[in-house]
UniProtKB/Swiss-Prot annotation:
Keywords: Host cytoplasm, Virion. The keyword Nucleotide-binding does not apply. This is Virion infectivity factor. Determines virus infectivity. Residues 10-22 have a biased composition (Basic residues). The keyword Zinc-finger does not apply. Residues 1-22 are annotated as: Disordered. Its main location: host cell. It comes from the Viruses.
Amino acid sequence: MERTIQSPMGRRRGSSGRRKRNANIISPPAYAIYPAPQYRYPRWEFVMNDLYSQTARLQKEEIIITYRYAVWAREWKIQTGFLDLGYLMTPAGTHTTGELNELDLFWVRYTLCQHRSPKWRELLLGEMTHTSCRRTAQAAVVSHTKPHTLQRLAGLTLVCNQNLCWYPVGTVTRNSPLWMHFTTGKEPTIQQLSGHP
């Protein structure tokens, strides 16, 4: 049997189009809205922004950055010509959702040199004997990318910005995640990444 609606107004779907009698100037915070609004698709902008983590992995000369919110995950692919994730890293304080497509999200990792490129984990674990320099990274970029491509341009830009690098501090073990919050050893939240306490 068809459901009868117990209201004289018919079935009203959304409230966005209609005039509200005394619409408040200041809107209540989300937790005060009752019952909780049901959306038909996830609204990226409004997801609680402390439920957030970011990881990157490499696949066939592409860096794949995964931003993971509470329930949904979203991926960005950034084409780089070279295959070693060891040359790239994400600094603290650069990423908001809007800045994601910018290349200066990434910096090259090493600053000093004996002209050989170390592995990043080695460096963090304190097992490093040499430290690397821009020249090495530049050589790596040039040897792994085709000339006159955006990849090479991007790679060389990263190498130029190399002194802007940032290291996560703290105990790093062989299988710890690439980005770590420096006091707790967990992956950082968006506030920590953006420099808020």
